[in-house]
C-alpha cells in the first residue's frame, strides 16, 4: 500500500485511515483540501467520534485535478465533487483486461448521499447552502465521463451486491456503461 485515497472526511470513509497507515507506514494519505477542516479538533464532532471510533491522522497530500496519482500501471484522476462534503473527491481510471486487451473505464463518485444537503443538516453543521449548487454542477460534469464500470462509495449506490448475485458468473459483473449516467441522474 503506497497511497490511501479518502473520498471525503466522514467517519465511514476516513475513520480507518490511521489504522491503515499503521499497517503501511510508507503510505501517503490523500484528502480533498476543503475537507481538511473536519480534522481540526474544533470540527471533529462532524465526524461523530462520540458514536464511531475515530483516530486522528495527518493528511500528507491534497488532491489536485491536474495531477493524477500514479500507482504502478494506474493513473488515477481525481475530480473535486463538493456536495456530500465540501472536499468530496471522485476518482477515474482505466484498467486493461490482460487476457483480451479491452480497456475498461472505471469511476467512483466520492459521496452520492444527499442527506448532507438537507436544510437541517446544513444548519446543524454550519456548512454553506451553496453546496447544493456545487453538487449539481459537479454531477453534470462527471455525467459526461465515459464509464464502463461505476464503483459506488457504498454498495447500494450501484446495487453492487445484487449485481454480483445476478451476474456473478460473468467476468465483469459490474460492467454496465449506462449505470454511471443513471447514478448521476438519480
Regions found by a protein language model. Name each.
Residues 9-15, 36-39, 86-88, 114-118, ...:
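Active-site environment of divalent metal-dependent phosphoester hydrolases
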Residues 1-10, 29-32, 80-82, 108-110, ...:
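Active-site neighborhood of phospho(di)ester-bond hydrolases with catalytic His/Asp-centered motifs
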Residues 33-80, 85-86, 122-146:
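Metallo-beta-lactamase
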Residues 15, 19-23, 56-117, 137:
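Catalytic core of the metallo-beta-lactamase
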Residues 1, 24-28, 74-75, 103, ...:
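Loop/turn elements at helix/coil->beta-strand transitions in domains of secreted/extracellular proteins
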Residues 1-68, 170, 183:
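Active-site HxH/HxHxD metal-binding segment of metal-dependent hydrolases
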Amino acid at each position: 500500500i503506497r497511497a490511501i485515497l479518502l473520498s471525503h472526511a466522514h467517519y465511514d470513509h476516513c475513520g480507518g485511515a490511521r489504522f491503515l497507515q499503521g499497517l503501511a507506514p510508507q503510505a501517503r494519505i490523500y484528502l480533498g483540501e476543503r475537507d481538511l477542516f473536519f480534522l481540526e479538533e474544533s470540527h471533529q464532532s462532524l465526524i461523530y467520534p462520540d458514536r464511531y471510533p475515530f483516530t486522528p491522522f495527518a493528511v500528507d497530500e491534497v488532491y489536485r485535478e491536474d495531477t493524477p496519482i500514479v500507482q504502478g500501471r494506474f493513473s488515477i484522476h481525481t475530480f473535486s465533487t463538493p456536495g456530500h462534503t465540501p472536499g468530496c473527491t471522485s476518482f477515474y481510471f482505466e484498467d486493461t483486461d490482460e487476457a483480451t486487451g479491452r480497456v475498461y473505464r472505471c469511476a467512483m463518485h466520492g459521496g452520492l448521499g444527499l442527506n448532507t444537503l438537507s436544510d437541517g443538516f446544513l444548519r446543524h453543521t454550519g456548512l454553506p447552502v451553496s453546496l447544493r449548487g456545487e453538487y449539481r454542477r459537479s454531477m453534470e460534469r462527471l455525467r459526461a465521463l465515459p464509464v464502463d464500470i461505476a464503483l459506488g462509495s457504498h454498495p447500494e449506490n450501484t446495487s453492487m451486491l445484487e449485481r454480483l448475485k445476478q451476474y456473478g458468473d460473468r467476468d465483469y459483473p459490474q460492467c454496465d456503461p449506462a449505470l454511471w449516467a443513471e447514478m448521476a441522474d438519480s
